[in-house]
Design a protein with these regions (language model features):
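C-terminal motif of bacterial Sec signal peptides marking the signal peptidase cleavage site
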Residues: 16-18
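Sec-dependent signal peptide recognition
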Residues: 3-10
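Short, structured beta-strand segments at or near domain termini in extracellular proteins/domains
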Residues: 460-474
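Post-signal peptide N-terminal segment of mature Sec-exported envelope proteins
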Residues: 27-56
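Short proline/glycine-enriched turn/loop segments at secondary-structure junctions
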Residues: 420-425, 451-458
Length: 493
């Protein structure tokens, strides 16, 4: 009898399962018991403002020629990169000033909510709509009273400005323009040796797992002391939770405007130091004096700024970041893979017009029409739709600089990222810089040319642009490849 009931219950379960199988495309069922997959939800990724899509492809990275200075063979390798969005031109003074002003306004809002400046609680949100406590954050929907502020509000606003002791000029206090942000280190968290579950750290079943093994991990943290000085520390401690993969940074984001003096001593460049970043006449010129750390901070801010603007629809939007060295060269070479971003030979047309802003001859900076930087986008774009990939300003990449270059990386989406700790030797803080600049000769503006700079140094000839990975798009199927169900199936060769 029990056996009969068991068989009967099994039949009932199978019947119910077959009834539930259906033809649902969004649930767990499949047509006729076949596994058809779960469609899930998708969204059409909007084209990012001011960016162009660089489609996936391959190239021979590097150059076959020899280093003309040292006579060394330069590293080359066949590599492939996935599709990504890239700024059509370098980040401009106007764009970067928006970042600096956002930092300024965030400081003012913090102080408007501070009891020492009147304590207007409406500038900081600490409860949700139901009155439950939440992580405090600034209220950006409430305007700063720039016009007709009361006494406390005026003190809060003026607190971010300073007066030049000689000229009496009211200036933004650059030393206060600190941006704090956090990042989650997905790459480190994915490594087996850092798994929180000890059993997942080694898949070799012949190896005895020690459940009490102590795994040490390093993470970056930062704070500002009472004197306003930023202190960065790299902590090494036992791995205990996912929070150990969160790094905290505080970066002073104001560009080093003194780079115009320090880069070119015994030159009359004071006007650039005082006005290049702040004057409206330079709005559309590439921002300079921004170091690698500041460029990364800009990318983080730009990501969060977009997410706040898009709201819930930003769930699958990829973060803004600096391009890898491989992405930069691939994008610069254009669809033809040229040595220079343009298709023609040489650096100027038959009419004598230059294709880029660089140093055409010894002591001659102006033959191409500019003495220093030029407005972005005044020269023709390459076949990828990108401007100024040669000359104007050299550009930061995310990649650490090594002599081996691409030879020390994977041949798929190659990257060599190293987050140097404060205690690391200074030599480990070099990052790869690409593209050449307004001060460089022709040989230095070629797409494969590599140079370097320390990550905490801003130069008058180095800027940057951002990229964003494209959310997965498949390759086009080969013509005539059909499955029995009539759906196109990709052929592999």
């Amino acid at each position: 009898m029990k056996k009969f009931l068991s068989i009967l219950s099994t039949v009932v379960v199978l019947l119910l399962a077959s009834c539930m199988g259906g033809t649902s495309k969004s649930g767990t069922g499949g047509a006729g018991g076949e596994v058809t997959g779960v469609s899930g939800s998708s969204m059409q990724e909007p084209s990012p403002y001011g960016m162009v899509l660089v489609k996936r492809g391959s190239l021979k990275m590097g150059t076959e020629s020899t280093d003309s200075l040292w006579g060394k063979d330069l590293p080359t390798r066949e590599i492939s990169v996935d599709a990504f969005w890239m700024d059509e031109h370098e980040v401009t003074n106007s764009m970067y000033r928006q970042f600096v002003f956002w930092v300024r306004d965030s400081i003012i809002r913090e102080r408007l909510a501070d009891p020492a400046y009147g304590g207007d609680e409406s500038y900081k949100i600490e409860e949700d709509k139901n009155g439950d406590p939440i992580t405090p954050h600034l209220n950006w929907n409430k305007s700063i009273p720039w016009k007709n502020p009361d006494e406390d509000q005026q003190r809060a606003i003026e607190s971010v400005y300073t007066i030049h002791p000689f000229t009496g000029e009211r200036m933004l206090d650059a030393s206060q323009m600190n941006y704090r942000y956090e990042t989650f280190d997905y790459a480190t968290a994915a490594l087996r040796k850092y798994r929180l579950n000890p059993a997942e750290r080694n898949l070799n079943t012949d190896v005895q797992v020690d459940p009490n093994e102590e795994v040490m991990i390093s993470k970056d943290t930062a704070y500002v002391d009472d004197e306003g000085i930023i202190h960065r520390e790299t902590l090494t401690r036992p791995l205990s939770s996912m929070w150990d993969f969160v790094n905290t940074y505080i970066i002073n984001v104001y560009p080093d405007t003194t780079c115009w003096i320090n880069d070119f001593q015994n030159a009359e460049n004071e006007v650039y130091m005082r006005l290049y970043f702040s004057h409206a006449n330079y709005n559309d010129f590439p921002v300079v004096g921004v170091n690698w750390e500041q460029a990364n901070a800009f990318c983080n801010w730009r990501t969060n700024y977009l997410i706040r603007g898009l709201g819930a629809s930003a769930k699958f939007i990829q973060r803004y970041r600096l391009p890898t060295e491989a992405e930069w060269e691939y994008a610069a070479r254009g669809k033809e893979g040229n040595e220079l971003p343009w298709t023609q030979e040489g650096v100027k047309s038959d009419k004598g017009c230059f294709y880029a802003n660089f140093k055409p001859d010894r002591g001659n900076y102006t033959e191409d029409g500019s003495l220093i930087t030029s407005k972005v986008g005044i020269f023709s774009a390459n076949s990828n739709g990108l401007y100024d990939m040669a000359g104007n300003v050299a550009e930061w990449t995310s990649t650490i600089f090594t002599e081996a270059g691409v030879l020390s990386m994977s041949d798929m989406n190659p990257e060599l990222y190293y987050n140097a700790a404060k205690e690391d030797p200074y030599a480990l803080k070099k990052k790869s810089v690409r593209g050449g600049s307004w001060k460089d000769p022709e040989s230095f503006i070629k797409s494969a040319w590599r140079s370097s700079e320390y990550q905490n140094v801003g130069r008058s000839f180095i800027g940057f642009r951002c990229v964003r990975s494209q959310v997965g798009t498949g390759a086009k199927a080969a013509k005539g490849a059909k499955s029995s169900g009539g759906k196109t199936r990709r052929q592999r060769h």
